[in-house]
Amino acid sequence: MSATDDLVSALRAADAVQFGEFELSHGGTSEYYVDKYLFETDPECLSAIAAAFADRIDEDTTLAGVALGGVPLAAATATEAGVPYVIARKQAKEYGTANRIEGRLDDGEEVVVVEDIATTGQSAVDAVDALRDAGATVNRALIVVDREEGGRELLAEHGVEMAALVTASDLLDAE
């Protein structure tokens, strides 16, 4: 069994892949849904994802978890790989430091975005833009599930290579 098959099995065992009619965050609908909260709170899934992501990064990389779903993934991967991470908020908070990027980030630092699910890719692109505005160099994004609905292409338009652990096809073809 491949690493992809193992992860698909873990996602299904956590009941993270559901079928029915679902409204998605971008306003579209889908006959299936991948519940990030179920796979991100399942220790077997989270551990497998962190190990797979850690294998795909260099030791001098900083990770950036896209709030909310990318944060536990970035934290687990950073712990697994022994690298730092920052949090990319959807918008700057209106209190405290009012930062959009939380954590230590040096100018020119190489950052890899970590995201749970890519549908259109817009959330990841927004995080990339915020990180670049903060001085980071961002060329890669690690995604757990690529729904194969344009996310890879949108990220590529912004100069970011997407690496997904599983695709919608992997999830839907598995029985």
From Swiss-Prot:
**What EC number(s) has UniProt assigned to this enzyme?**
2.4.2.10
In terms of InterPro entries, this protein maps to: OPRT, Or_phspho_trans_dom, PRibTrfase_dom, PRTase-like
Q: Please give one Gene Ontology molecular function term for this protein.
A: magnesium ion binding
- Per UniProt, orotate binds at 119, 147
* Needed co-factor(s): Mg(2+)
Primary enzyme class: transferase
Pathway note = Pyrimidine metabolism; UMP biosynthesis via de novo pathway; UMP from orotate: step 1/2
Instruction: Provide the reaction this enzyme catalyses.
Output: orotidine 5'-phosphate + diphosphate = orotate + 5-phospho-alpha-D-ribose 1-diphosphate
Q: Which GO terms describe its biological process?
A: 'de novo' UMP biosynthetic process; pyrimidine nucleobase biosynthetic process; UMP biosynthetic process
Q: Where does 5-phospho-alpha-D-ribose 1-diphosphate bind?
A: 89-90, 93, 115-123
Q: Where is the signal peptide?
A: none
- Which UniProt key words apply to this protein? Glycosyltransferase, Magnesium, Pyrimidine biosynthesis, Transferase
One Pfam match, by short name? Answer: Pribosyltran
Q: Quaternary state and partners of this protein? A: Homodimer.
Q: Which family does it belong to?
A: Belongs to the purine/pyrimidine phosphoribosyltransferase family. PyrE subfamily.
What role is this protein assigned?
Answer: Catalyzes the transfer of a ribosyl phosphate group from 5-phosphoribose 1-diphosphate to orotate, leading to the formation of orotidine monophosphate (OMP).
Which PANTHER family does the entry mention?
OROTATE PHOSPHORIBOSYLTRANSFERASE, URIDINE 5'-MONOPHOSPHATE SYNTHASE
What is the protein's name according to its record? Orotate phosphoribosyltransferase
Tell me the gene name: pyrE
